[in-house]
Amino acid sequence: MAPLVKNHGEPQHAKILAIGTANPPNVYYQKDYPDFLFRVTKNEHRTDLREKFDRICEKSRTRKRYLHLTEEILKANPSIYTYGAPSLDVRQDMLNSEVPKLGQQAALKAIKEWGQPISKITHLIFCTASCVDMPGADFQLVKLLGLNPSVTRTMIYEAGCYAGATVLRLAKDFAENNEGARVLVVCAEITTVFFHGLTDTHLDILVGQALFADGASAVIVGANPEPKIERPLFEIVACRQTIIPNSEHGVVANIREMGFTYYLSGEVPKFVGGNVVDFLTKTFEKVDGKNKDWNSLFFSVHPGGPAIVDQVEEQLGLKEGKLRATRHVLSEYGNMGAPSVHFILDDMRKKSIEEGKSTTGEGLEWGVVIGIGPGLTVETAVLRSESIPC
């Protein structure tokens, strides 16, 4: 793809100026998780379900995950692990305080890397599917961080796993259309609301129990970065959202007295794979319409599961290793929802520095973030990497 011509007399595209990530302290290794799950849910006698779950975990390509839930929390709140028991109040009371706190940890890391006074934050975007409250998690984070009470807030609830790309689109719009804006974006998920006891009638729970994980990400976005003061990581060039036709049954979640019930169709990888070339082609038409060499790009693909990642790789004809960062996050963190694609970008830019690459995008100039979630909704963001000083 030919480089875009930049007119330095005009506002530049928004840029990611810093990235921070955080996880709860409790790490669960996948090889040990089946023992934990069947013990705490009092299902050790269910050898049939245990065999199914063991196979799902083996195929998950996840080595470890981080969760807020502990055995102590579950023992104190048996309604959480009793399938169908009314437990929404217990879950929400926990999450409405813990989700903003996890977001705060990621935000403080991003702000530290950015290196500017917190008073320069003009906009806040908070995204979560874990809790619902008024005033919301955005309001709580303003207090936790000590942000200006006049900061412009945007709260996104229940968007799901594609929203890690959505927030980049919104931050881009805010940064490019408000002179001097510095946008703090925070995505935080604690999947306690999705935790359930086991049952023969709802086997989707086994898949979620093998993949879902907790984490928070924060990015700071602004246009026209201050020379020698702000150090951009990626430029946000173009964004696009689309719904895959006839796929609304693919990922469904409903808030109920028992928490979030969810349904995960085995057709999701097929839907994504069958449409990935089309939606990437249309995304890049917004840039210059010329790029069809997918191997010339770096990728941050939502790690919704190994079959989804495999389908993206296969249908785009990607070379081995092109999705290294995506597979690394799936292995070491699991599916954290919206924060996942930011974890991937963070890993990518750090690995690029470690390996002496010329850019933050694995030595490549152009790349793309692909968020995938309920709808099925696909949100893409075209990024341009930044040079790494020698």
From Swiss-Prot:
Q: Sorted alphabetically, which keywords does the UniProt record give?
A: Acyltransferase, Transferase
Family membership noted in the UniProt record: Belongs to the thiolase-like superfamily. Chalcone/stilbene synthases family.
Q: How temperature affects activity?
A: Optimum temperature is 35 degrees Celsius.
Q: What is its EC number?
A: 2.3.1.177
Which PANTHER family does its entry note? CHALCONE SYNTHASE, HYDROXYMETHYLGLUTARYL-COA SYNTHASE
Asked whether the UniProt record includes Transferase among its keywords, one would answer: yes
Which reaction is the catalytic activity of this chain? benzoyl-CoA + 3 malonyl-CoA + 3 H(+) = biphenyl-3,5-diol + 4 CO2 + 4 CoA
Organism lineage:
Eukaryota, Viridiplantae, Streptophyta, Embryophyta, Tracheophyta
Q: Which GO terms describe its molecular function?
A: biphenyl synthase activity; identical protein binding
The lineage's top-level taxon is Eukaryota
User: Biological process (GO) annotations?
Assistant: phytoalexin biosynthetic process; polyketide biosynthetic process
Induction data: Up-regulated by elicitor and by endogenous H(2)O(2).
The residues annotated as the active site are C161
Keyword DNA-binding attributed: no
Gene of this entry: BIS1
Q: How does it assemble?
A: Homodimer.
pH dependence per the entry? Optimum pH is 6.5-7.0.
Can you say what this protein is called? 3,5-dihydroxybiphenyl synthase
Its biological function?
Type III polyketide synthase involved in the biosynthesis of the phytoalexins bisphenyls and dibenzofurans. Can also use salicoyl-CoA and malonyl-CoA to produce a diketide intermediate yielding 4-hydroxycoumarin after cyclization and enolization. Can also use m-hydroxybenzoyl-CoA as substrate, producing m-hydroxybenzoyl diacetic acid lactone as a derailment product. No activity with p-hydroxybenzoyl-CoA, CoA-linked cinnamic acids or acetyl-CoA.
Q: Kindly give the InterPro entries that the UniProt entry links to this protein.
A: Chalcone/stilbene_synt_C (IPR012328), Chalcone/stilbene_synt_N (IPR001099), Polyketide_synthase_type-III (IPR011141), Thiolase-like (IPR016039)
